[in-house]
Amino acid sequence: MSVYSIRRIMLESYPILFICVLIGLFAGGTLEKSLTGIKGTLVIMMVPLLNGIGGNLGCILGARLGSALHLGTVEPRLKGRVLRKNVHASVLTSIGIFLFISVIFFVIACMWGMGFVMAAKHALAFILAGMLLTPVIVVSVVTLAFLSFQKGLDPDNVVIPIATSIIDVAAAISLLIVAITIVGL
Amino acid sequence: MDVRSVVIQGLAILIICTFIELGAGFMLKGMEERFMLIPGLAIMTLPLLDLRGNINGALASRLGTALHTGVISPRLKLTAELTANLSASLILSLITSATIGVLSWLMGSMMGLPVNILQLMVIAVIAGFISGLVLALLTVLVAVFTYLRGWDPDNITSPAMSTIGDLMTVTCIYLAVLLVG
């Protein structure tokens, strides 16, 4: 008798993946609509960075909260020192990494032959989008972790796929809105 | 827990991920013209990226648990348990990629774009399956390697794999687009 069955893995995974695809299509649709607007800029290059790194930040917080809920060091309520410290660490990490990436985009834009103002606008767009995304990451991961734990589901299986899909949509939308409307790339 | 050490560890792994994601970014920038030529391609790129991370993230986390509980031993042998895990991941890749193809066509039609269902399906399935195959094998290697090294899969394996997955997926989408024309 084997522990893993193909049938069971598929039946448990496909519904969640399907929900993720539905959420992800909104991110894709937004990108498709903005293609002409971002032509000639480096915004499309920023998409995997904001989505990927944002997703990674969510994964790390989700995995940490999942373990803490199982261990009992965090209770599914919005208070307590361990929860506050975890959120604090995530916000600091996100500010640090998004600042680092915006500096990289400043350098890439300069090397691409764009002027100082255009390069600075690229950096500004990335950091603004990152700062808009950070609360979405924290709120969605904490909410999903608590809800799934209260419902008796394993946060490890539910939180990360759904949170990364939500983060993808939020990242693509905030990046495109910031880049086109606010910074005017 | 110590906030400082969590931030430092997180930043270290994320800086490495940043450079890999930049590769994916350059690839997308290089595909910009193709996005204009193939309506609907941009729609499915993001769900395909997301899918890769989700399937391999789940595979990595199941393998991590299986290694810790001794169900799978840290050797590269195709046992029944490992085969079931790998096959399930590959079948899921295939079925979900096809789902993405159909739904992107539907979404594109609703947005009033001149989308071609056959073209989108072929690109989605080829890109999803090739990247799924490469990533599944890589996930097994990385899971066994990190387990033998004693690294924490929560903090290192998952972010690293999802980032490598992004780069592989964008590469495979580009290959599929070149193949379809």
PLM region descriptions:
Chain A
Residues H70-L71, I108-A109, L144-S148, I182-L185:
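Short alpha-helical linear motifs
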Residues I60-A68, V139-T143, I177-I180:
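A cytosolic-side transmembrane-helix exit/cap motif
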Residues I44-M46, V142-A145, N157-V158:
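Short hydrophobic "helix-edge" motifs at membrane interfaces and signal-peptide entry regions
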Residues L147-D168:
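Interfacial loop-to-transmembrane junctions
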Residues M1-G115, A119-A123, I127, M131, ...:
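Alpha-helical transmembrane segments and their membrane-interface boundaries
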Residues V136-Q150:
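Transmembrane alpha-helical segments of integral membrane proteins
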Residues A172-L185:
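Juxtamembrane boundary at the C-terminal end of a transmembrane helix
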